[in-house]
Curated annotation (Swiss-Prot):
Additional record remark: This protein is encoded from a satellite RNA, called RNA3.
Region Disordered, annotated ranges: 46-128, 151-175
Protein name, per record: Protein P3
UniProt biased composition (Basic residues): 97-114
Domain of life (superkingdom): Viruses
UniProt record similarity statement: Belongs to the nepovirus protein P3 family.
Length: 360
């Protein structure tokens, strides 16, 4: 069970947090919106991969949908993306509207009816016979009667609109993104909600044996870890820390260990991880790796292709911002990349695999 639980979170859907460290130069290179989109896509991609594993016989077409057997049929049904597939292959029937489209249309119809003074949209079932009762005024007594004894009585308070436009579905393992600065992150680590007592645990302090503590007991260790965590923000050049909360706790421990989809340098090293309390620490991974792992670089290259390419090539050659990579592309490989002869290509490939720097 993850100990990082926010106060407003229901106990049925515990969160597993991941922090993405964005180096300062990447924060300058990409906007926060682009980084956020990158993270959303990568999280969705990982969730989708975990949810439906593709068998060996299943291939995927260009849109990413599954095809069984011998690939797509010669003539597929021409149905627009937002509608359900037709049983007859979309030949004669008009496309069925999705529930969302129907709701949207109803909403528009209601708005149009409201704008015209004193008119209401025509209902299919004819006029309503029963007049609707006025909303009952919520009093203390009625709230006691309606609510169970344990629940807090809300004195006629209007429910707040959801904070996010597309709120993630807890049952399907949706993802929320929060972009926070290091200071906010420090503040958030102090806000610990205790699920048993229902109280907030304060920031960890040293034990009372001396002014600096004994340095051995659990309280002192927690305090030292917290101090080191605060200092690590200065040593790593991060201007942004983006925290990803997955709404559904993963049953297996595949978040903690790099899988086949995540390369070696995916998670940040241990000294850059958030301090562990009772449960798992907040995992942090590198945004550079994330950009390489996910196909979002195509999207980013649309903005400025040469700049992004130059950045990645410079990185690959000098490996300054992504030093945990096992494979270093030598400068010779970059120099001989233009040659088309097969010997040169195989030579470059072998050099890249071995990772040796050879002077021309």
């Amino acid at each position: 069970m993850d100990s990082h639980i926010n106060a407003n979170t229901s106990f049925s859907s515990p969160r597993v947090s991941v922090e993405i460290l964005v180096p300062t130069k990447y924060a300058k290179l990409f906007t926060l919106k682009q980084l956020t989109r990158m993270l959303v896509l990568s999280c969705k991609h990982r969730a989708r991969q975990a949810a439906n594993p593709v068998s060996k016989r299943t291939s995927r077409d260009r849109d990413g949908s599954k095809i069984m057997g011998q690939g797509p049929p010669a003539v597929g049904p021409r149905v627009s993306k937002g509608h359900k597939q037709q049983s007859d292959g979309g030949a004669s029937l008009a496309p069925v509207k999705s529930k969302r489209a129907v709701r949207r249309e109803k909403r528009r119809c209601r708005k149009k009816g409201a704008t015209k003074a004193g008119t209401t949209p025509v209902q299919k079932g004819g006029h309503c016979v029963h007049a609707s009762k006025g909303q009952k005024q919520a009093t203390y007594l009625s709230s006691l009667l309606s609510n169970p004894s344990g629940a807090k009585s809300r004195m006629g308070a209007v429910s707040k609109p959801p904070q996010t436009k597309n709120a993630p579905d807890a049952s399907k393992g949706g993802f929320t993104l929060t972009a926070i600065s290091p200071a906010e992150c420090r503040k958030e680590t102090a806000r610990r909600f205790h699920p048993i007592t229902g109280t907030f645990k304060g920031a960890p302090g040293f034990c009372t044996r001396s002014r600096e503590g004994c340095g051995v007991c659990a309280a002192c260790e927690a305090k030292l870890a917290q101090l080191g965590f605060d200092r690590s923000f200065d040593s790593i050049g991060t201007s942004r820390v983006i925290r990803v909360d997955s709404m559904k706790e993963e049953t297996s421990d595949d978040m903690a260990s790099p899988s086949a989809t995540e390369p070696v340098g995916f998670w940040a090293p241990a000294e850059k991880q958030a301090p562990r309390w009772e449960g798992q620490p907040i995992k942090r991974c590198d945004v550079v790796t994330l950009a390489r792992v996910t196909p979002v670089l195509r999207m980013l290259r649309k903005v400025d292709p040469t700049f992004v390419d130059n950045r990645l090539l410079w990185e690959a050659a000098h490996s300054d911002s992504f030093s945990s990579a096992q494979v270093r592309i030598p400068l010779v490989a970059l120099a001989t990349r233009g040659r088309e002869d097969c010997c040169g290509t195989s030579f470059v490939y072998s050099l890249t695999q071995v990772g040796i720097l050879v002077a021309l």
